[in-house]
Design a protein with these regions (language model features):
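Radical SAM [4Fe-4S] cluster-binding motif and immediate context
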Residues: 1-120, 125-127, 131-136, 140
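Radical SAM enzyme core and accessory elements
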Residues: 171-253
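Short, surface-exposed, charge-dense and proline/glycine-enriched linear segments
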Residues: 56-63, 85-92, 112-118, 150-158, ...
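Short alpha-helical functional segments enriched in proximate histidine and acidic residues
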Residues: 21, 141, 145, 209
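Alpha-helix boundary/capping detector
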Residues: 54, 98, 138, 168, ...
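Generic recognition of short, well-ordered alpha-helical interface segments
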Residues: 107, 162, 197-201
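Flexible glycine/acidic-rich beta-alpha junction loops that bind and position SAM and/or redox cofactors
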Residues: 38, 90, 94-95, 125-133, ...
Length: 253
């Protein structure tokens, strides 16, 4: 899709558009705002005078750059979405993301927190190395690290991707109804170490556990953005999940 290129809008153009929005909170939509550190830091300096709050997405490696974190926080960043993907190093290695080091996750999150920003983690379930224990292990880590928000997804082999080609060759594609390929409501392939039903139930359980009131309370105590950012977002997620029938009792947990 991106043809292996990073494209930039001029910093001044982004800052003008940013300043033109009347709202206090802005989502800066960039798949990895830390992809070009020089550009990112120049952008943060340009955003600082406008006094708004913003969030965006970054790689875990952004947490290693103190200047990046300091400038982001000073410019109004309140949350970074970090694609952790998995708390299993074997699963990360499987999908060529060995550069994500699970043993460095907790420290990276701690560094982001130290600069007054919260973390939203992106998690995927269903890798070949995932066992039924992955749901509890993920929940335990996210709570212990004080992750403020999490977005969970079911691994989905979209048509045209190498993953779909491999699973199709292995006879593991279960349906070609593309409307079910949404990463949330259906498991469209045969997982290696559990049934499709177990994967779907585990995904639902992970959501329900993370956004339970007890988990919210425990994680809130570690949040640098507590009441004005973390609590409203968690309660909104919790309400939406309950509305859609995600609760621990329903999953037998």
């Amino acid at each position: 899709m991106y043809q292996r290129k990073v494209r930039h809008r001029p910093v001044e153009a982004v800052a003008r558009e940013y300043a033109s929005f009347r709202g206090k909170v802005i989502i800066v939509w960039d798949d990895n705002i830390a992809a070009d550190m020089h550009y990112a830091k120049a952008l943060f300096r340009a955003l600082t005078p406008h006094g708004k709050w913003w969030s965006s997405q970054a790689s875990i490696y952004a947490a290693k750059d103190d200047e990046f974190l300091e400038l982001a926080a000073r410019s109004g960043c309140k949350q970074l979405f970090i694609g952790l993907e998995s708390v299993s190093q074997a699963s990360l290695n499987e999908v060529s993301k060995a550069f994500n080091r699970v043993d460095e996750y907790a420290r990276a999150i701690e560094r982001i927190h130290a600069h007054g920003m919260s973390v939203q983690a992106g998690i995927v379930f269903g890798f070949d190395h995932d066992t039924e224990a992955v749901f509890e292990e993920t929940g335990d880590f996210l709570e212990s690290a004080g992750v403020q928000n999490a977005t969970f997804n079911i691994l989905t082999p979209y048509p045209g991707t190498p993953l779909h080609k491999r699973l199709d060759a292995e006879g593991r594609i279960l349906t070609r109804d593309w409307s079910t390929y949404n990463g949330r409501t259906h498991v469209v392939f045969q997982p290696r170490q559990m049934s499709p039903e177990t994967l779907l139930a585990g995904y639902r359980y992970a959501n329900a556990r993370f956004y339970s009131l007890g988990s919210i309370r425990r994680r809130l105590s570690k949040s640098p953005t507590q009441l004005f950012w973390t609590l409203p977002l968690n309660l909104a997620y919790a309400f939406a999940l309950r509305r859609d029938g995600f609760n621990r009792r329903a999953e037998g947990k």
